[in-house]
Amino acid sequence: MRRIAAFRQISVVAWTFGAVVAGLTLAMCWTIGSTVASAQSPGDRAQLAREMSAVPVSLAQGLVASRSEGTPISAKFELEDGKLQLSVYTDKDGRFAEVIVDHKSGKVAKAEAITDADDLSHAKAQSEAMAKAKRSLDAAASVAMKQNKDYRVVSVMPALKGGHPVAEVTLVKGKDWKTVSEKLD
């Protein structure tokens, strides 16, 4: 009788722990996946969409260029101080860097170590997701673009969902924005 009670107690503890881990994972994925959309006001999104319509370099080209600084673990076009930039997070032997790719030439403009606590936390989570991935971010972005004609990729952010790596790909066409999930395993 005591064994059954002890087993039930262990089962409840294990289930509770699993539920907490699943909840935290879901919250982290939601936070990371919505970073681009929530970090920008509607005016910023409109400006970003306008500026992206004339950009000659694709996000996929930025991912390729950033490989000289490490393995790409996320990428996004963003407005920094009102100016467009292509930012790629990379991981090289456990060291994280933000690589800025010139959105006109496609060449690396600068690379800096990530030291901000929030950015570092995001980079670690993205690196964990990419460690389980069998497909690259540029492959996921390419599939998303092919399935969404005339859209441009604004960002590709990996996360773990249910223990599986996925890429949240944000796309824009004119004023129309959408986010799609692409499996990375």
Predicted features along the sequence, with ranges:
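Long, terminal "pre-/pro-" and other extracytoplasmic accessory regions
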Residues: 2-185
